[in-house]
Amino acid sequence: MRPNIVTEAGVQTRVGQWWNAIPFLTSSVVVVCGVIYLICLLTGYDTFYEVCFLPSAIISRFQVYRFYTAIIFHGSLLHVLFNMMALVPMGSELERIMGSVRLLYLTVLLATTNAVLHLLIASLAGYNPFYQYDHLMNECAIGFSGILFSMIVIETSLSGVTSRSVFGLFNVPAKLYPWILLIVFQLLMTNVSLLGHLCGILSGFSYSYGLFNFLMPGSSFFTTIESASWMSSFIRRPKFIMCTGGNPSSYIPTYSAQNTTSSGFSTGNAWRSLSSWLPQREASNQSSEDSRFPGRGRTLSTARDPTAPAGETDPNLHARLLEDSSSPDRLSDATVNTVADSRQAPIANAAVLPQSQGRVAASEEQIQKLVAMGFDRTQVEVALAAADDDLTVAVEILMSQQA
């Protein structure tokens, strides 16, 4: 046995786990772009003149297919590698929130709007009566980076962070982050399409500010597509994420210590947007709860009804809780007293017990909804049990575990 076989197996296992964690659409885009580059490499196809985004060819010969072929072809190994490495984290987060079908629609929409903006700006530069700049009309652009710049703007706008790190070297304000990347890539790399990246940024801001809302169909449209018979083979795949009818501008998890902003896309507003389209139970006294301990409160070993108003509390219980809990003897005494109190009311306990047993097991429908959002089934069952079958609280628990 070779001495490094354990290390090789460990790396292979970690790569497999990383790949299995990437949702269906994001991994499909990575595979498609990688396979296309490999085919071009093996066949020696390196001109890309027939598939690139060429404004002059689109206008003169109406080759609209270039809108979409240009984004899946790449010119070099580093080109496709960097683009796909940037796509995996952003695409995975967006797909887990939106669903696979909705993200596919958004990708096609961004590809279309990027191309239209690119075409308009190139036409204005090439055919204006003041100063004609023909270079943009004959620029042959390829690559997925235009879509990536749109995703960067959307993710930055929705996350609510106030600053972003540029390659781990320095921090910049979140609103300037896409523009800093645009300048950095233009200065550090050759043969970079400035107009293609610029149009991606403009499309991302247009989507973030709601200018594309009239182009985004309702949740019933995506549900109809998912219920089609020809989609069954895709839906059965474990990495496919169902569209749950949510707002495409819903919460995107971030990992920043400062998560506050004055814009309308703050984390709190985004979380309320996510919870608004989840099934809700009847209204409860959520406003009186301590924000540090979300969810329904439960009093152990007591005859009180758990659904009783929060104002009707036991004064003796409050007194015991306010005492110094550092002594083990006091803790044990409080436990014995609480158990003794519960034994004095066996009839009331018997009345409460059937009501609590009815909510022990989470319904299969609730489990399937959370599994369809990309969460692990075992974690879903544990979260639902901890949240007392409250989907909103269960989602909050699962998202905090992922963070």
UniProtKB/Swiss-Prot annotation:
<dbReference type="GO" id="GO:0004252">
    <property type="term" value="F:serine-type endopeptidase activity"/>
</dbReference>
<keyword id="KW-0472">Membrane</keyword>
<feature type="transmembrane region" description="Helical">
    <location>
        <begin position="198"/>
        <end position="218"/>
    </location>
</feature>
<dbReference type="GO" id="GO:0006508">
    <property type="term" value="P:proteolysis"/>
</dbReference>
<keyword id="KW-0812">Transmembrane</keyword>
<feature type="transmembrane region" description="Helical">
    <location>
        <begin position="103"/>
        <end position="123"/>
    </location>
</feature>
<feature type="transmembrane region" description="Helical">
    <location>
        <begin position="141"/>
        <end position="161"/>
    </location>
</feature>
<dbReference type="InterPro" id="IPR035952">
    <property type="entry name" value="Rhomboid-like_sf"/>
</dbReference>
<feature type="transmembrane region" description="Helical">
    <location>
        <begin position="176"/>
        <end position="196"/>
    </location>
</feature>
<dbReference type="GO" id="GO:0016020">
    <property type="term" value="C:membrane"/>
</dbReference>
<keyword id="KW-0645">Protease</keyword>
<feature type="domain" description="UBA">
    <location>
        <begin position="361"/>
        <end position="401"/>
    </location>
</feature>
<feature type="active site" description="Nucleophile">
    <location>
        <position position="145"/>
    </location>
</feature>
<keyword id="KW-1133">Transmembrane helix</keyword>
<dbReference type="InterPro" id="IPR015940">
    <property type="entry name" value="UBA"/>
</dbReference>
<feature type="transmembrane region" description="Helical">
    <location>
        <begin position="70"/>
        <end position="90"/>
    </location>
</feature>
<dbReference type="InterPro" id="IPR009060">
    <property type="entry name" value="UBA-like_sf"/>
</dbReference>
<dbReference type="Pfam" id="PF00627">
    <property type="entry name" value="UBA"/>
</dbReference>
<keyword id="KW-0378">Hydrolase</keyword>
<feature type="active site" description="Charge relay system">
    <location>
        <position position="197"/>
    </location>
</feature>
<comment type="function">
    <text>Probable rhomboid-type serine protease that catalyzes intramembrane proteolysis. May function in senescence.</text>
</comment>
<comment type="similarity">
    <text>Belongs to the peptidase S54 family.</text>
</comment>
<dbReference type="InterPro" id="IPR022764">
    <property type="entry name" value="Peptidase_S54_rhomboid_dom"/>
</dbReference>
<protein>
    <recommendedName>
        <fullName>Rhomboid-like protein 15</fullName>
        <ecNumber>3.4.21.-</ecNumber>
    </recommendedName>
</protein>
<dbReference type="Pfam" id="PF01694">
    <property type="entry name" value="Rhomboid"/>
</dbReference>
<feature type="transmembrane region" description="Helical">
    <location>
        <begin position="22"/>
        <end position="42"/>
    </location>
</feature>
<feature type="region of interest" description="Disordered">
    <location>
        <begin position="282"/>
        <end position="316"/>
    </location>
</feature>
